[in-house]
């Protein structure tokens, strides 16, 4: 890439850091709309533009706990609790681990050194586990109603489930959805 463009990208990237409006990249396009349209498109993208994404801001921290959160559908999702770090202008100390498959893939354990980032500059995620102690146990009982849990496997993705239809988490979260703006708008 030409040094002039590299200098421009560096200047813009540094300017974005000071900008109060978040930006996750840059799109260059022709300023001649007629010429740009004449270039057409590929099967997915216009030929008159090119997009560049900034590297995600990544911070190292220490995993302190996994909180298991029951949902209205019965899924029990792992939430990573870690030492607070500054990411994209906010303090972050929690991130969804999504499901049992991701837990196992990351080989998480309490005290592990992990790298975290914000996906799309918004959603905290664990990028990698630097120590991989793999010592976290999957709960055998629902953290809310204490019913025996099961692991479902759909399309190769393992999820932890509370099968109890009377689980208080399911009832409370279903009621919360019912009275929400998207529900009855109460």
Model-assigned labels for residue ranges:
Residues 1-186:
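RNA/tRNA-interacting regions in translation and RNA-turnover enzymes
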């Amino acid at each position: 890439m030409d040094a002039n463009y590299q200098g421009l990208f560096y200047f813009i990237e540094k300017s974005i850091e000071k900008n109060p409006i978040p930006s996750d990249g840059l799109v260059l396009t022709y300023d001649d709309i007629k010429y740009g349209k004449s270039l057409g498109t590929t099967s997915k993208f216009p030929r008159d533009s090119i997009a560049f994404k900034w590297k995600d801001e990544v911070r190292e921290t220490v995993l302190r706990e996994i909180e298991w959160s029951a949902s209205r559908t019965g899924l029990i999702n792992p939430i990573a609790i870690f030492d607070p770090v500054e990411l994209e202008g906010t303090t972050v100390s929690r991130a969804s681990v999504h499901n049992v498959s991701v837990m196992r893939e990351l080989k998480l354990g309490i005290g592990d050194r992990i790298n975290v980032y914000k996906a799309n500059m918004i959603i905290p995620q664990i990028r990698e586990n630097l120590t991989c102690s793999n010592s976290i146990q999957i709960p055998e009982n629902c953290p809310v109603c204490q019913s025996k849990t099961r692991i479902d496997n759909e399309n190769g993705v393992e999820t932890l489930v509370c099968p109890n239809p009377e689980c208080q988490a399911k009832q409370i979260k279903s009621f919360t959805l019912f009275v929400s703006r998207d529900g009855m708008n109460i």
